[in-house]
Amino acid sequence: MFENFSPSTMLAIKKYAYWLWLLLALSMPFNYWMAQDSAHPAFWAFSLVIAVFGIGPLLDMLFGRDPANPDEETQTPQLLGQGYYVLLTLATVPVLIGTLVWAAGVFVAFQEWGWLGRLGWILSMGTVMGAVGIVVAHELIHKDSALEQAAGGILLAAVCYAGFKVEHVRGHHVHVSTPEDASSARFGQSVYQFLPHAYKYNFLNAWRLEAVRLRKKGLPVFGWQNELIWWYLLSLALLVGFGWAFGWLGMVFFLGQAFVAVTLLEIINYVEHYGLHRRKGEDGRYERTNHTHSWNSNFVFTNLVLFHLQRHSDHHAFAKRPYQVLRHYDDSPQMPSGYAGMVVLALIPPLWRAVMDPKVRAYYAGEEFQLTAEQSERPAAS
């Protein structure tokens, strides 16, 4: 539908369509409202998850792809100079935190949907915090301003994953698409093999990287300058606050949505780099990261909801490049669907491998000898 639109037209559409993230946040009160008079209230607790992963891929197919890039000489400088795009990301913080607190109250008070409905409510809130909260946090922690860094930290603290703020920038972006990166899935590895190591290593590696930073400055590792301590204390304060306000069920809700959000993040990590690798030179060093080391997806609907996260190839080639000016490359490896569809595909390993393994082999024609799961030797989590 959008393939033949000019870059100028697409930029005009996207400027306001980035507000589509509000659909996810506002779906929570809408679904609660629908559940109150429903004979099947538990359905409405799950309905956001059904919409995201069931209807989302269909909307991607309906609206098609967006291959348009801004003109580097004229449009990109204009886009970079507009504070509107920064305010758009910052606006997610009060909306998401407010929704999270409100949803905890509903989780405790609305007993009509029982434990099944409560499970659906946790999955729905976790999907919102993963698909919007962590995605926006990812954008913000790459920025230099203290305000954006703090906003990103708050969103990550709300899902108990402050380590991402450190490990993603100083670990993942350094070692992406190599065996040294726990967030880069190896060829032949299922998402269920990938997740346990990603949880453990990324948490521990964040502390290791922060310790390295502090030691280089001659500072104590467990001093007040360790930002992970402060962010995890904020997560603890939020947990205690939810317990004080809503009781033990409030704490269950807070931890449950955090686990769902983090799991969604790591599944997306799996999708973004599956089977791709940076070639190692004779000197033992890996080639420089470029736009061929991440899977790209130009399906316009999910790209708008996710702030262009699916133009991941350009993001890894130019990590500081803001979302509104990320570019499409024809020679980047291309996903057959947007992230919503790819997450569903990843959860069914035989189907995932049937779709994705031929794409990886075709992309690395002549280098198939490197595409072995045995290559995925993982670093010790020290």
Curated annotation (Swiss-Prot):
Pfam families: FA_desaturase. It catalyses: octane + 2 reduced [rubredoxin] + O2 + 2 H(+) = 2 oxidized [rubredoxin] + octan-1-ol + H2O. Its EC number is 1.14.15.3. Keywords: Cell inner membrane, Cell membrane, Iron, Membrane, Metal-binding, Monooxygenase, Oxidoreductase, Transmembrane, Transmembrane helix. Disulfide bonds: none annotated. Fe cation 1 binds at residues 138, 142, 168, 172. Induction: Induced by n-alkanes when cells grow slowly during the exponential phase. Expression decreases significantly when cells reached the stationary phase of growth. Repressed by citrate. It is a multi-pass membrane protein. GO terms for cellular component: plasma membrane. One of its GO terms (molecular function) is alkane 1-monooxygenase activity. It is found in: Cell inner membrane. Pathway: Hydrocarbon metabolism; alkane degradation. GO terms for biological process: alkane catabolic process; lipid metabolic process. Binds 2 Fe(3+) ions per subunit. The chain crosses the membrane at residues 10-30, 43-63, 90-110, 121-141, 146-166, 236-256. It comes from the Bacteria. Its cofactor is Fe(3+). Belongs to the fatty acid desaturase type 1 family. AlkB subfamily. This is Alkane 1-monooxygenase 1. It comes from Pseudomonas aeruginosa (strain ATCC 15692 / DSM 22644 / CIP 104116 / JCM 14847 / LMG 12228 / 1C / PRS 101 / PAO1).
